[in-house]
């Protein structure tokens, strides 16, 4: 039995307490309500043997009344050869959860997976990532994510099947729960990053680079868009189609930029990592590349 499975029953009981604490409010950097809720989740995680904590959640939005900021508590980075994340040497691994890959707008799991693969391939091919090998791990059918379980939208899975997990398309209510009122209408997707903690629950920096150690990352996509029963029916998830459609690869490129360590920046709409969706963008711009270079330049060859 995996260490995640071994503690899942006790976590289910504890999660019920966490769910009684609403997110609410504007989830901007340092927002008291958002940070307090993250602390509630982290209290549950602290009672487990995983030695991880939620550190930041970063939204990609359509720019209509929703915060385009991150829930953010500190700088984090991946650590090469970190045995705690079952690291594949100096590689970064990712997994696409096929079970939630189809969309209400009619895309199949195979279509969305191919778009996500293309997005990760774009980052891999960018010059700043030349020292890094991004490896895809096969979906073996196990539940590979945990963040959704804190809101009642899935079981507590095994979070160490890959460094980055593409958790799939979830319903509007999940994004309302995470992003507060209006989140289900305005948030296209978000990336949630976990860090490692020591036996006392304190963040770790095992390589002394003055950044907290990234443990894992999960990406969630909003299935409201293109759902005929919602007010976002006219903004369907599509493959390589312009607005008002939402291009899967563009959103995946942005969110996996977060997964690899980038924050929101760049003059809108001229950067992949701008926080508001502005149509198809499949190639990083100089601001994106500069940020990625700063993150990965010290990665061992």
Language-model regions: role of each:
Residues 1-11:
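Bacterial N-terminal signal peptides that target proteins for export
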Residues 10-18:
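Bacterial N-terminal signal peptides
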Residues 24-108, 183-212:
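Disordered inhibitory propeptide/activation segment of secreted metzincin zinc metalloprotease zymogens
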Residues 37, 41, 108, 112-119, ...:
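Stable alpha-helical elements in mature extracytoplasmic
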Residues 98-113, 234-243, 247, 275-282:
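Second-shell loop/turn segments in exported
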Residues 113-251:
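Metzincin-family zinc-dependent endopeptidase catalytic domain
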Residues 256-270:
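Catalytic Zn2+-binding segment of zinc metalloproteases
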Residues 274-300:
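Post-HExxH zinc-binding segment in Zn-dependent metallohydrolases
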């Amino acid at each position: 039995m995996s260490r995640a499975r071994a503690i899942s029953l006790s976590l289910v009981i504890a999660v019920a307490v966490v769910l009684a604490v609403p997110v609410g409010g504007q989830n901007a950097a340092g927002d008291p309500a958002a940070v307090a809720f993250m602390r509630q989740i982290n209290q549950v995680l602290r009672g487990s043997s995983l030695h991880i904590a939620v550190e930041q959640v970063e939204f990609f939005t359509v720019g209509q009344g929703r915060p385009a900021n991150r829930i953010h508590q500190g700088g984090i980075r991946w650590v090469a050869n970190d045995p705690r994340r079952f690291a594949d040497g100096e590689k970064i691994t990712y997994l696409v959860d096929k079970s939630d890959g189809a969309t209400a707008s009619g895309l199949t799991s195979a279509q969305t997976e191919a778009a996500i693969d293309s997005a990760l391939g774009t980052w891999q091919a960018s010059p700043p990532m030349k020292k890094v090998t991004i490896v895809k791990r096969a979906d073996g059918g196990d539940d590979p994510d945990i963040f959704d379980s804190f809101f009642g939208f899935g079981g507590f899975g095994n979070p160490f099947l890959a460094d980055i997990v593409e958790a799939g398309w979830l319903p509007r209510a999940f994004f309302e729960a995470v992003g507060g009122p209006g989140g289900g209408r305005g948030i296209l997707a978000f990336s949630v990053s976990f860090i490692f903690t020591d036996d006392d629950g304190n963040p770790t920096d095992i390589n002394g680079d003055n950044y907290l150690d990234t443990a894992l990352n999960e990406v969630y996509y909003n299935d409201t868009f293109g759902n005929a029963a919602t007010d976002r029916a006219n903004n369907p998830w599509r493959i390589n189609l312009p607005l008002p459609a939402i291009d899967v690869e563009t959103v995946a490129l942005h969110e996996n930029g977060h997964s690899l360590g980038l924050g929101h920046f760049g003059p809108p709409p001229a950067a992949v990592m701008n926080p508001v969706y502005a149509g198809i963008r499949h190639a990083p711009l100089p601001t994106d590349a500069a940020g990625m270079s700063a993150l990965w330049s010290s990665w061992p060859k």
